[in-house]
């Protein structure tokens, strides 16, 4: 930090499931909040999945870390290991994806999100601008990331994808970094980050087509605007990697109520173990209290409720809110 002339903020990469990724990150974020209160903190958090599970207690760690970092983090991009795993298998024909395969794909996404800080473009956006556009309420700060095109070199050799094709692909759940179904949720915000050989005219046409074709529902208190960034630097790939070198790509960041499905899945797994107090003694032995578990779980229940509430129409009368 001392070497920086104009520090904008911190990017923190961690997993939810492991002890270090969850525990140490929580401590680190708290320290950063104390020492650099005004600087923004963005997380890239790896959400646990059954395919590449490292610990039985992943649901505990995930809930505990989400609770402690919820107040500290300005924006968190969740990456669901299962979603990445499936993309590698389906789009890249990798039968048994390794961490390297998964990480290269995640790297591509991080690169897209930070491209606007690093290169020039027609419609450039910086880190703070994302937050302003994507985070309507402090707690609702988990955008869904979708990336396209994810194709292997063999496939790309035969086809180059147009702006409208890659834009359309962003609305396919199979290209999302978290398994959830936005068709069942409502959007609060939507940012499209294009890079490479892309002109505004094509983007406008692609988005107009999406608005007419797709049933994209925005919450009624939000204008149905898509924020667009265009960056002229085409995506680069790791030499000899899985991903094809393409002329244009897009990364979509959307804040949708559908991502609450991910919390619901974790909460359910937490509940199954916690009902039996399984494995809790290990945490208590390290100086934690059982109360911290229920406190964290209640906070997550409140988060699910927050998502439910932002999705309900603001026109509904007060009395109707009682039923839930």
From Swiss-Prot:
Gene Ontology CC terms, in alphabetical order: cytoplasm; microtubule
GO biological process, any: microtubule cytoskeleton organization
SUPFAM superfamilies: Tubulin C-terminal domain-like, Tubulin nucleotide-binding domain-like
Keyword GTP-binding: yes
Top-level taxonomic group: Eukaryota
Catalytic site positions: 129
Any GO molecular function: structural constituent of cytoskeleton
Main location group: cytoplasm
Enzyme class at the top of the EC tree: hydrolase
Annotated site residues (Involved in polymerization) in this chain: 324
Annotated residues for binding of GTP: 15, 19-20, 54, 81, 103
Coiled-coil regions listed: none
Enzyme Commission identifier(s): 3.6.5.-
Cofactor: Mg(2+)
Post-translational modification: Some glutamate residues at the C-terminus are polyglycylated, resulting in polyglycine chains on the gamma-carboxyl group. Glycylation is mainly limited to tubulin incorporated into axonemes (cilia and flagella) whereas glutamylation is prevalent in neuronal cells, centrioles, axonemes, and the mitotic spindle. Both modifications can coexist on the same protein on adjacent residues, and lowering polyglycylation levels increases polyglutamylation, and reciprocally. The precise function of polyglycylation is still unclear.
Sorted UniProt keywords: Cytoplasm, Cytoskeleton, GTP-binding, Hydrolase, Microtubule, Nucleotide-binding
Compartmental location: Cytoplasm, Cytoskeleton
Reaction(s) the record says it catalyses: GTP + H2O = GDP + phosphate + H(+)
Quaternary structure, from the entry: Dimer of alpha and beta chains. A typical microtubule is a hollow water-filled tube with an outer diameter of 25 nm and an inner diameter of 15 nM. Alpha-beta heterodimers associate head-to-tail to form protofilaments running lengthwise along the microtubule wall with the beta-tubulin subunit facing the microtubule plus end conferring a structural polarity. Microtubules usually have 13 protofilaments but different protofilament numbers can be found in some organisms and specialized cells.
Family statement drawn from the similarity comment of this UniProt entry: Belongs to the tubulin family.
Additional observations: There are at least seven alpha tubulin genes (alpha-1 to alpha-6, and alpha-8), and a pseudogene (alpha-7) in chicken.
Name of protein: Tubulin alpha-8 chain
Species annotation: Gallus gallus
The organism's taxonomic lineage, starting at the top: Eukaryota, Metazoa, Chordata, Craniata, Vertebrata
């Amino acid at each position: 930090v001392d070497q920086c002339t104009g520090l904008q903020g911190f990017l923190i990469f961690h997993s939810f499931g492991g002890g270090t990724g969850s525990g140490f990150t929580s401590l680190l974020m708290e320290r950063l909040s104390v020492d650099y209160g005004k600087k923004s903190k963005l997380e890239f958090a790896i959400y646990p999945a059954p395919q590449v599970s490292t610990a039985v207690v992943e649901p505990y760690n995930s809930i505990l870390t989400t609770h402690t970092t919820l107040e500290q983090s300005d924006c968190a991009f969740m990456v669901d290991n299962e979603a990445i795993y499936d993309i590698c298998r389906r789009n890249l024909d990798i039968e048994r994806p390794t961490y390297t395969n998964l990480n290269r794909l995640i790297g591509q996404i991080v690169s897209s999100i930070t491209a606007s800080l690093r290169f020039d473009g027609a419609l450039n956006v910086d880190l703070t601008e994302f937050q302003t556009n994507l985070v309507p309420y402090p707690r609702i700060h988990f955008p869904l990331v979708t990336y396209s095109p994810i194709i292997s070199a063999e496939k790309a050799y035969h086809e180059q994808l147009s702006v409208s094709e890659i834009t359309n692909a962003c609305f396919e759940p199979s290209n999302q970094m978290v398994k959830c179904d936005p068709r069942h949720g409502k959007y609060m915000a939507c940012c499209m980050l294009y890079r490479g050989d892309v002109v505004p005219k094509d983007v406008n046409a692609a988005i107009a087509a999406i608005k007419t074709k797709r049933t994209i529902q925005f919450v009624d208190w939000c204008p149905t605007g898509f924020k667009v960034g265009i960056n002229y630097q085409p995506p680069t790939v790791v030499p000899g990697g899985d991903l094809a070198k393409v002329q244009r790509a897009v990364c979509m960041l959307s804040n949708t109520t559908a991502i609450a499905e991910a919390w619901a899945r974790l909460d359910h797994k937490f509940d199954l173990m916690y009902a039996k107090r399984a494995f809790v003694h290990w945490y208590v032995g390290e100086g934690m209290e059982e109360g911290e578990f229920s406190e964290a779980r209640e906070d997550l229940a409140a988060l699910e409720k927050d998502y439910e509430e932002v999705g309900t129409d603001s026109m509904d009368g007060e009395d109707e809110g009682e039923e839930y």
